C-alpha cells in the first residue's frame, strides 16, 4: 500500500535530518546556540526508516541538517541508500488555486506502477565542507545538491553566517559539485527585508556566471529568535520586479509537486527559482514528510507535534508495524499551513532542529 493522505496527496518525497548540529551561526536561524538540542541517531536507524518508507512509495530522499556533512560516515550512508529501489507511485490529486487539494475526477486512489529508476538522493548543505566531499558523494550515488547561501558578497556573507572566510569555502564547494556532475546544482537564498534583499540582482548575475540555479525563499517563521513578521518577507512578486530591472525572465513550466516557480533569463543563460510559501502557498500539492535527527516524523514544516518513529523501533516493532505507524501518521497530515492568519501557531521546532 502506498502513502497518501486524507486529501488525496501522494507522499513521495522524504527529508531526513541526520544532525541538528551546524558549523554556521546564521543570524536569522540561530541566536547563539551552537550545539545540538535533540542529537542524532546511528546511520543504520535512518537507513531502516528510509527502507520502510521506500517500500511505501517514497522515490526521493533528501539529506538535511543542521549541516549533514558534519556527520562522519555520510558518504557510506549515501552508498547504502543508493542500493534502495523505489516502487513508484502515480499521484491521485490536483492542486486548486487556493492551495488546497482535490481528488482527480477519474481516479480515486494512488495507483502503483513498476519503477526501474534508482532512488533520487539529494543533499542540502551550507557548502563549507563540500569541496572535498562532492566527488566521493557523487561516486556513492548522490544525485544532486542544494547549497544554502544568503549573499554573494564575501563580507556580507561573513556577517550573516558569523564565520570568517566562509564564502571562499562555499564557492569552492559549489564549483566542485558542478565538476562532479551533481546536477541540477541549486543555490538557496533566504531573503529578508532590510537584511539581504539587495542581493537579488547579484544572485541573478551569479546564476549566469556559475551555471547554477538560484532559488530565492520567502522568509518563514521558523527562526530561533521568533522575530518573523509579515513585513520581513520579500515576496515573489517583488523578487520578479527587481530581477526584471536586471534582465527579462521567462517562466518555465513546472510539475505540480515542485515547490519553486521557475524562470530562465530571456537569452537562456541562468535559471531563477522562487519558493513562496507565504505569498503563494503550494500546500495543495505537497508530497513531503520529514524525519528529524532524533527520529520523529513531521508531516508539515509548521506542525505543532512530532510522531516518534524511532520510539517504535526501540520497542522492537517489525517492518510491518512501522509501515502501519507511518500510514497512521500520514493520514493526519495537515491540509495547509496558516502563516499570517489569526490562528497561526508557530511550529514546535525551529528550522535547524526540523531539518532544512
What spans do the regions from the language model cover?
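Radical SAM/AdoMet-radical enzyme domain recognition
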Residues: 43, 47-62, 71-98, 109-215
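Conserved G/P- and acidic residue-centered "switch" motifs that form tight phosphate/ATP-binding loops
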Residues: 67
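Radical SAM enzyme core and accessory elements
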Residues: 1-4, 280-356
Amino acid at each position: 500500500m502506498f502513502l497518501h493522505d486524507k486529501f488525496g496527496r501522494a507522499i513521495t518525497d522524504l527529508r531526513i535530518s541526520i544532525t541538528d548540529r551546524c558549523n554556521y551561526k546564521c543570524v536569522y536561524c540561530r541566536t547563539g546556540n551552537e550545539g545540538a538540542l535533540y542529537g542524532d541517531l546511528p546511520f543504520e536507524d535512518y537507513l531502516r526508516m528510509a527502507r520502510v518508507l521506500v517500500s511505501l512509495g517514497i522515490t526521493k530522499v533528501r539529506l538535511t541538517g543542521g549541516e549533514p556533512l558534519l556527520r562522519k560516515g555520510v558518504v557510506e550512508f549515501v552508498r547504502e541508500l543508493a542500493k534502495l529501489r523505489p516502487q513508484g507511485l502515480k499521484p491521485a490529486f490536483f492542486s486548486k488555486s487556493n492551495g488546497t487539494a482535490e481528488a482527480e475526477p477519474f481516479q480515486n486512489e494512488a495507483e502503483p506502477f513498476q519503477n526501474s529508476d534508482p532512488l533520487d538522493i539529494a543533499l542540502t548543505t551550507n557548502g563549507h565542507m563540500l569541496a572535498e566531499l562532492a566527488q566521493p558523494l557523487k561516486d556513492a550515488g548522490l544525485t544532486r545538491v542544494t547549497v544554502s547561501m544568503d549573499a554573494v558578497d564575501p563580507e556580507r556573507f561573513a556577517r550573516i553566517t558569523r564565520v570568517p572566510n566562509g564564502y571562499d569555502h562555499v564557492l569552492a564547494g559549489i564549483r566542485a559539485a558542478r565538476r562532479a556532475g551533481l546536477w541540477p546544482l541549486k543555490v538557496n537564498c533566504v531573503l529578508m527585508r532590510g537584511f539581504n534583499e539587495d542581493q537579488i540582482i547579484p544572485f541573478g548575475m551569479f546564476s549566469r556566471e556559475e551555471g547554477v540555479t538560484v532559488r530565492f525563499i520567502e522568509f518563514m517563521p521558523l527562526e530561533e529568535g521568533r522575530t518573523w513578521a509579515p513585513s520581513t518577507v520579500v515576496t515573489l512578486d517583488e523578487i520578479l520586479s527587481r530581477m526584471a530591472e536586471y534582465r527579462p525572465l521567462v517562466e518555465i513550466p513546472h510539475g505540480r509537486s515542485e515547490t519553486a516557480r521557475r524562470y530562465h533569463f530571456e537569452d537562456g543563460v541562468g535559471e531563477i527559482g522562487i519558493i513562496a510559501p507565504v505569498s503563494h502557498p503550494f500546500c495543495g500539492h505537497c508530497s513531503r514528510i520529514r524525519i528529524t535527527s532524533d527520529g520523529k516524523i513531521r508531516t508539515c514544516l509548521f506542525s505543532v507535534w512530532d510522531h516518534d518513529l524511532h520510539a517504535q523501533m526501540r520497542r522492537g516493532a517489525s517492518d510491518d508495524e512501522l509501515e502501519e505507524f507511518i500510514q497512521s501518521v500520514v493520514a493526519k497530515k495537515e491540509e495547509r499551513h496558516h502563516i499570517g492568519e489569526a490562528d497561526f501557531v508557530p511550529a514546535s521546532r525551529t528550522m535547524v532542529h526540523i531539518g532544512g
